[in-house]
Amino acid sequence: MIQNIVIIGTQWGDEGKGKIIDFLTPQVQYVVRYQGGHNAGHTIVVNHKKVTLHLIPSGILHDNIINIIAGGVVLSPVILVKEIQKLKKINVLVDDRIFISESCSLILPYHIAIDLAREKISTTVITNNNVIIGTTGCGIGPAYEDKVARRALRVYDLYNLKNFENKLKNIADFYNFQLVQYYHAEPIDYHVVMDEIITVSDILIKKVIDVPELLLNARKRGDKIIFEGAQGSLLDIDHGTYPYVTSSHTTSGGAIVGIGVGPKYIDYVLGIMKAYSTRVGNGPFPTELSGDIAEWLCTRGQEFGSTTGRRRRTGWFDAVSVRHAIKISSINSACLTKIDILDGLKYVKICVAYQSFNGEIIYNFPYSLENLKNITPVYEVLPGWSGRTTGIKKFNQLPLEAKQYIKRIEEVIGIPIDIISTGPDRLMNIIVRNPLNF
């Protein structure tokens, strides 16, 4: 029986994970975020109303589901409290349904300030390649830097606010020197930061729980758990398009580390992928489009970041990069989203391989940035469809060409597609196989 399922993105994020998690949540008892921070926006449509969350797990919109923010997440205290307040205003039950790990590292204003300062200058200290990453400006990277450098403030530091203030002052001095001397930016007043912390600290402390112990006991009881990934596999710090990546592990392995459970407690991995490709920010994008079709995908797909509002770059479905995501996360099956956005196109393309500058055909995703810059997609062209897929709930009701497109994607990525999303609403899905019913 499947008890624990990891749900991750197979592209560069924005694949529609939130909607699918929201759809599957009624079948589980827990939803757990394990990496990233509030740079991960997930938008869910319920009864034609959009709800956008950045930090709180998607399961919060269902009564009786316990939502956990595990230790691998970098947590903004202010953002968490704001999201809790926003949910309460729309009558979502929050109390006793959101818990956090005391080992979460905190995102504080100096992380955001240094993040924005780095992005403003023409070159960045994040890499040695004289490039701008195109971050969300949420302070995620600097917060993870503090974590690795062993100077981060964590949730458990809130237990003693006097000690917290002393540590805060030292770290603020560290960052203010950089902000003023190197980036010529305004310093952060640690007194203001401390005032914010005093305001929210009690709320956070009351939500602390021993996450590994809680989930171990849940498994013993036979409860089902969704481990909710943020961003996408191609943004993984080790296996993504480095240096144009996020600062955490976005693969299924990140769940093990970020939560504090062993590999044997991962029963299934579901990969979410769009029927086309998108990317926000800078970095390699082999199948990127320009012109009318790019505009079509962006406009019809509403491809604007839920965190930054930035326009997403769009391109054809890239089977090479998705196969890479499947390989590095041991993905069992896939969910294909936004098939409805392709309705009306005369043709659709699938990138099945790359061709190098010297004519070599490449079937595996390169790690080297230089190799990625010098490849050309090898496409298969399939007929488009004029019929509508929006809202269809049975596979055999899809237009013939849409079915052919989906089947061909299954063939070239090498795993089955269990779920097909046919629209933004949580119930607009074709369920070929329910991964939680195995």
From Swiss-Prot:
Keywords noted in UniProt: Cytoplasm, GTP-binding, Ligase, Magnesium, Metal-binding, Nucleotide-binding, Purine biosynthesis
Active site: D14 (proton acceptor), H42 (proton donor)
One term under GO cellular component: cytoplasm
Subcellular location as annotated: Cytoplasm
Enzyme class: ligase
SUPFAM superfamilies: P-loop containing nucleoside triphosphate hydrolases
Pfam families: Adenylsucc_synt (PF00709)
Top-rank taxon: Bacteria
Catalytic activity field: IMP + L-aspartate + GTP = N(6)-(1,2-dicarboxyethyl)-AMP + GDP + phosphate + 2 H(+)
EC number: 6.3.4.4
GO MF annotations, alphabetized: adenylosuccinate synthase activity; GTP binding; magnesium ion binding
Residues binding substrate, per UniProt: S306, T307, T308, G309, R310, R311, R312
Cofactor, free-text remark: Binds 1 Mg(2+) ion per subunit.
Chief location bin: cytoplasm
Pathway: Purine metabolism; AMP biosynthesis via de novo pathway; AMP from IMP: step 1/2
Chain residues that bind GTP: 13-19, 41-43, 312, 338-340, 421-423
Binding site for Mg(2+): D14, G41
Residue numbers binding IMP: D14, E15, G16, K17, N39, A40, G41, H42, T136, R150, Q231, T246, R310
Transmembrane segments: none
Assembly, per entry: Homodimer.
HAMAP family found in the cross-reference section: Adenylosucc_synth
Function: Plays an important role in the de novo pathway of purine nucleotide biosynthesis. Catalyzes the first committed step in the biosynthesis of AMP from IMP.
Family: Belongs to the adenylosuccinate synthetase family.
Matching NCBIfam families: PRK01117.1 (NF002223), purA (TIGR00184)
Protein name as catalogued: Adenylosuccinate synthetase
Protein source organism: Blochmanniella floridana
Lineage: Bacteria, Pseudomonadati, Pseudomonadota, Gammaproteobacteria, Enterobacterales
